[in-house]
Amino acid sequence: MKTTSSPAALALAEAAPMSNVRWRIFLILLLLTAINYIDRASLSVALPLIAPEFNLTPAMEGLMLSAFFWSYALMQIPGGLLLDRFHTRGIIGAATIAWGAFQALGAASHNWLVLLFTRIGLGVAESPIMPAGAKLNGSWLTPNERGRGAVLVDGGAPLGSALGAILISALIAWLGSWRLAFVIAGVGTILAGVLAWKYIRNHPSEHPGVNEAELRHITEGNASAHAAAAKASIPLRVLLKDRSIFAMFAGYSCILAVFYGLLTWMPSYLHKEHGLDISAMGGATFLIFMCGFVGELIGGWIGDRWRASGASPNLVMRVMFSGSSLVAAACILGAAYVGNTGAVITLLCVAMFFIRWCGMYWCLPAIIGGPSRTGVLGGTMNFCGNMAGVLVPIIIGLIVQFTGAYFFALIFFVAAAVLIAVFSSLIDYRERTF
């Protein structure tokens, strides 16, 4: 714990400007999450080259693409339990280095089974990152900063989705090999893992770059959280009686149902329904997801500023989540009826801008579970969300197959966005004092 040894030293420390180590840590987490999504996208981009090389049937291609998501989803709860038991810093560093290794090892695949194994390993290794972000959100940020912290961690999803296809395809075109592209992506991920391990600390008091002003800002802002941490670990049976937990799981499932549904099916929708070629489709997809990234940052800033003004957490969060999801629902509904391609892309940009405000869901595990249960709650929330993310692309495929159009697929997304508003209104966003 940092201390000052004399009144003069204390006065000097108080006069010094506050360091900003906490925000550098969350920028690193943004980088890790973006890399997370770039590495996920690598197989999708390289599949047209990999499929003929390994003689993959369409069914085998689907298996290959889904392998990551199944292992990623199934490891969310175990990953959260590990974070509650062991040091967050070490798990982040080890997980990032491991997923970089699996990404690079994919280049050595001599048949589809080996490549499948590397994708399963990639999902396992990436699984602790989002719950780890929720854990650090609770220990490094004050209640009035957690919205921005949550959207920095979650903002890597739209940012990585926007950049992934462009970067991986550019590497393949430049190097003339999907294998070399996988190696470079893997090595870059490993270097990011080393950076994260060297800079991140579990608690502000452990970081050499945190000065007295920043440490005092964090500890005083989290006085109630520290008081809760001093108590015994909250029994899970107590948490399971809290309606907010199940509403949080359901709400986040609907968020990822919309996001993953658009992520997987929007390019095909723009190509088949609106006639965009591959180049135009890529540009539109990049624009839509970049709007999501910008929206996520702006939403977190608005939420924190509103909280800092003295507004109650329930008012801020319910209005932010419900309002943004209903605006997104209205835009997607409009896209279902509008025929003009430019108008459709604009509506989807606005929808993605607002739906990503819900990235602030990642501050909820620390609020509801307290320091002792943030990891397992964050892992369970991400498990529920990613199971929806696994199932929704299949559901949308069946809808399109049986109806022959994308209209009812868009209506499905509208319904999911409305349900985000419903479930978000059922959550109590006040700090828990068990």
Task: Go through each PLM region and give its residues.
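Helix-loop-helix hairpin linking two adjacent transmembrane segments in secondary transporters
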Residues: V153, A157-H207
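Conserved MFS/SLC helix-loop-helix module at the cytosolic interface between two early adjacent transmembrane helices
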Residues: L74-L113
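Helix-breaking motifs and short loop linkers at transmembrane-helix boundaries and internal kinks
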Residues: N55, H87, F102, A108-V114, ...
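Structural signature of the two symmetry-related core transmembrane helices
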Residues: G90-A104, N314-L333
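Extracytoplasmic gate region of multi-pass secondary transporters
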Residues: L43-S44, L240-G299, C358, W362
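Glycine-rich segments within core transmembrane alpha-helices of 12-TM secondary carriers
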Residues: R148-I166, A173, G292, E296, ...
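Cytoplasmic helix-loop-helix junction between adjacent transmembrane helices
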Residues: T118-P158
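A late C-terminal transmembrane helix in Major Facilitator Superfamily
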Residues: A366-A405
